[in-house]
Structures are given as C-alpha cells and as structure tokens.
Amino acid sequence: MLRSPYSGGHLEVVVGPMFSGKSEELIRRLTRSLIARQRVAVFKPAIDNRYHASEVASHAGRTLEAVAVPDAQAIRAQLSGQGELLSAAPEGVDVIGIDEAQFFGPELVPLVLELADAGVRVVLAGLDLDFRAEPFGSMPELLARAESVDKLTAICTVCGAPATRTQRLIGGQPARFDDPVVLVGAQESYEALPRAPHRAQGGVTTPSPLAS
C-alpha cells in the first residue's frame, strides 16, 4: 500500500496473533511511505525491549527506527511539544506508525482519532486478543473506528492450520487463565494456535455460551 485509497487523514489497523507478521506489515507500509518521500514518525512502547530498544523489529529480523515511549501521552508530547490537543497535523509528519498498540492505554484512542482528523495517515499494529483469547485493551475500539482493518493469521507449528490465537507458555505448558495479561516475550513464551486447541490452565479461553 503506497498511496492509501482514503483521502486525507485516516486510521489503518493491522491485527493478529503472535508470529502473524504484524510488525513486518507495519514496517513494509512505512518503508513504502519513506520511499515515496513522505514524512514518517514511528513509535513503540518502551516495555517492548525484546529485540531493539529504539527500533520496531519483526520476528523475521526486519527493523525500522522508532521512538520508544512509555504511554500515549508521551507520543502526544513528542508530536505537539507540549502535550496539547492536535487540531492540525504535526509539523513535518505525513504518516505515523505505532507498533504493539495493545500495550498503550485508552488514551491512545483519542490521540489517533485527533491525528486522523488533522489529516495524518495513522497505521497501527497490535494483538487483537490476549493469551486468554479475550479482546486486548483498547484494540476493540480502535478496530471499530478504523477505516481499514487487516486481520492476519500465523501458522500453527503443531498442525499447520491457520492460527488466530496466541497461547502463552510457562515451562512449555499453557499459562493459567488468571495469569497477568501483559508479559513481553517471543517464541520462548508464546505460540500461535487455531481456535480448537486454544486453552489456558484453570479455564477455557474461548468459552461458548452454548456449552451450558
């Protein structure tokens, strides 16, 4: 996607489980914008230090320079200089990319909407579901408000089927359902699975209301 089919500012969201290529797709889109000589700003949560502290990195090894910030308010401050409301596009910015969007709090929603309303193309990548297969943070509202949504799948390394869920592992076994939601990790802590075998100890992560 070089030039978006949407005129003016808008919001694009790329979601999926771990290992589905979300960061890879974010890097691809932003790199194409850079090739087109568009002005791009990239942000990532400071909590994500798995590969590079100051780069967005895919599991395949592709990277793109980024600013690590603790929260959405820090992104606002970086763009406005004073953390004020963004009634106009930030000077020198055409496209803004944010990786691991699920780690930012609810303050991310009004920020990206302000940016889009101000004429900026905003591209987010993140997990739509946590390891319990429940909606992750503010991602549901971001998905609902986006002009463009792409849901990617990974590949289950057990059966080879398209994987839509993220299973957290502790000592090679599924994590407990009541374990903390946020745990930054990669292949040592997570695997991608299809719906059917996705479970967490202490509870089924995708309970069906028809089961009772």
Curated annotation (Swiss-Prot):
Keywords: ATP-binding, Cytoplasm, DNA synthesis, Kinase, Nucleotide-binding, Transferase
Alphabetical GO biological process terms: DNA biosynthetic process; thymidine metabolic process
Keyword flag Kinase: yes
Active site: E100
Pfam families recorded: TK
Bilayer-crossing regions: none
Name of the featured protein: Thymidine kinase
Biological source species: Deinococcus radiodurans (strain ATCC 13939 / DSM 20539 / JCM 16871 / CCUG 27074 / LMG 4051 / NBRC 15346 / NCIMB 9279 / VKM B-1422 / R1)
